[in-house]
Amino acid sequence: MEVGMVVVVAAKVLVSLWCVGACCLAAYLYRVVWVAPRRVLAEFRRQGIGGPRPSFPYGNLADMREAVAAARHQLAEARRRRRARDSGDGGSGAGIVHDYRPAVLPFYEKWRKDYGPIFTYSMGNVVFLHVSRPDVVRDINLCVSLDLGKSSYLKATHEPLFGGGILKSNGEAWAHQRKIIAREFFLDKVKGMVDLMVDSAQTLLKSWEEGIDKNGGTIDIKIDDDIRAYSADVISRTCFGSSYIKGKNIFLKIRELQKAVSKPNVLAEMTGLRFFPIKRNKQAWELHKQVHKLILEIVKESGEERNLLRAILLSASSSKVELAEAENFIVDNCKSIYFAGYESTAVTAAWCLMLLGLHPEWQDRVREEVQEVCAGQPVDSQSLQKMKNLTMVIQETLRLYPAGAFVSRQALQELKFGGVHIPKGVNIYIPVSTMHLDPNLWGPDVKEFNPERFSNAQPQLHSYLPFGAGARTCLGQGFAMAELKTLISLIISKFVLKLSPNYEHSPTLKLIVEPEFGVDLSLTRVQGAYRH
């Protein structure tokens, strides 16, 4: 009898403890997911900054998904009507509008119209401040304090791709990495890489020439894979030197890894689902292990050969860090350089060739410039510097189709910009496309392709952000521009480009803004161009 009573009492105690624990957990979640974000939003409301009303527990996520679904439906209907109409003017570019925001980011467009250039929204318990007011953007870009860092939102989800590399690190860790990597992208070193870039382009040029010869003088191709192969070859040779073939295999796996982590999952972040061995997580973890192993194998094989990977290795070794930490430093920054130097550059090249196919007058101007500057000699660093029209075309491409949709920052401490007080922990998003398409900054022809706008002066710090701005400006922008100018100049000197009737203009946002269905071009030889 006494034993039975003890069991009953023990059971009641356990139930009571479970109830208390459940109540405490519920109270904690309520405070973290609802109360804390509401306090931050209230602080912004006191400053006159509005935004859409969040819902528990996902904030404004449902509104965002609904807006995207509606926009996709409208795009699909427009595409269906266009195909049914089949006016026969394919390749003319009729109907192409250089403003992807209503299709890709429709919720931001609506909220900006409703609440102005500064507004708040939330995803789960994460509060965002969306800023497109030029004076505030300028102040943010001028900030050099380590209290303004990279956004930690979804950092754990992207951990397999970026790790603790320079793209995602903050504070002293970021400053240390930047100092190391910056040396490898000084202008003098970039100049020495142009011959390498020219060599890497030969496979693409030869393939297209052979295709034209086999198809009666014209080919219709989707250029994206060829452009990616070129970019992968360049960055592989730069990073891995003579081991570049293995390097390209690494980059293929990193691209798979990018696809695996490119879809943000707020539920996973809020519930800890990202730690569970579900299919998506297991795929990302396995790819991460493979990439880590392959990079370290190349490090061991490279010996004393000078390449970017070797430079990072030497810097890590001189920092007197533990072996595991040094290995992570090497691997994470290799992946960061891949993402910044391969994927973004390849997509920008595809957009640029699309625009040149759409605007033959600028294609002719660039071709004449390349022929005049090179005068029959191979492209080199000196000739690239003289190609002003080509530079303007690339700059305008980056204005209309910047690879990064946002400049993202996080207030690691309380900060103030342009009179706006920003509480600690708030994520700051600057919409690059909105700044690039502001008629007050760029003029009434803001949605038109007009490289001439870059002919006289450089744009202001707050108005042009394809490589970010301020202390965290992309270190590799000189390298990227050299790579783009090398490839485009070689292609334009050999081929006449025309937008293919198969081209479907549909920008989409993954980790970067890219053509959803690729870029289709019709190619013919330039009369008198040298044949391999």
Swiss-Prot record:
The keyword Iron applies. Its EC number is 1.14.-.-. Residues 1-2 are lumenal. It comes from the Eukaryota. GO terms for molecular function: heme binding; iron ion binding; monooxygenase activity; oxidoreductase activity, acting on paired donors, with incorporation or reduction of molecular oxygen. Pfam families: p450 (PF00067). It is a single-pass type III membrane protein. One of its GO terms (biological process) is lipid metabolic process. Highly expressed in shoot, spikelet and uppermost internode. Detected in roots, leaves and anthers. The chain crosses the membrane at residues 3-23. InterPro entries: Cyt_P450, Cyt_P450_CS, Cyt_P450_E_grp-I, Cyt_P450_sf, Cytochrome_P450_Monooxygen. One of its GO terms (cellular component) is membrane. Disruption phenotype: No visible phenotype and no change in the levels of 13-OH GAs; due to the redundancy with CYP714B1. Cyp714b1 and cyp714b2 double mutants have decreased levels of 13-OH GAs, increased levels of 13-H GAs, including GA4, and longer uppermost internode. Keywords: Heme, Iron, Membrane, Metal-binding, Monooxygenase, Oxidoreductase, Signal-anchor, Transmembrane, Transmembrane helix. Its main location: membrane. Its cofactor is heme. It is found in: Membrane. Induction: Up-regulated by bioactive gibberellins. Heme binds at C474. Catalyzes the 13-hydroxylation of gibberellins (GAs). Determines the ratio of GA4 and GA1. Converts GA12 into GA53. Belongs to the cytochrome P450 family. Overexpression of CYP714B2 in a heterologous system causes semi-dwarfism and increased 13-OH GAs content. This is Cytochrome P450 714B2. It comes from Oryza sativa subsp. japonica (Rice). The lineage of its organism: Eukaryota, Viridiplantae, Streptophyta, Embryophyta, Tracheophyta. The gene is CYP714B2.
